[in-house]
Amino acid sequence: FSVRTLADDRLIGFIAFDGISWQHGDTFVAIGIGDPTYRGNGYGTDAMRVMLRYGIMELNLARVQLNVFSYNERAIKSYLKAGFSIEGRQRGMLLRDGCRCDLIYMSVLRNEWLALNTDQLTASSEQA
């Protein structure tokens, strides 16, 4: 899916599920905001929230997961805001600018996401 600005419908990034396992009800999610001027403005967090809602409510997924390098603190903060939890790390996975960086594993489970979004879901069903 494309990530676009509301003001002028400018294409600024992408978000996608990768490798949905229908048998197990899980998938990886990937996101990228290409133009650095649009990073840190909530577009990624908003896109991830919409994607999680779609995956959990429409595709009936039980688990959505992603990996992120430890140097990408802005992304980690965004994923935590969207409902992800850190579940592990692979230490020293990447050499970047002479420093070793960890690969962080994050996921959100259906029941966790539902608990975090109960008020929003109730309001949506009352409007329908």
Predicted regions and their residues:
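Short, charged, solvent-exposed linker or helix-capping segments at domain edges/interfaces
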Residues: 40-42, 115-121
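Conserved catalytic-core motifs of GNAT/GCN5-like acyltransferases
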Residues: 65-68, 85-105
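Conserved G/P- and acidic residue-centered "switch" motifs that form tight phosphate/ATP-binding loops
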Residues: 9, 42, 72, 98
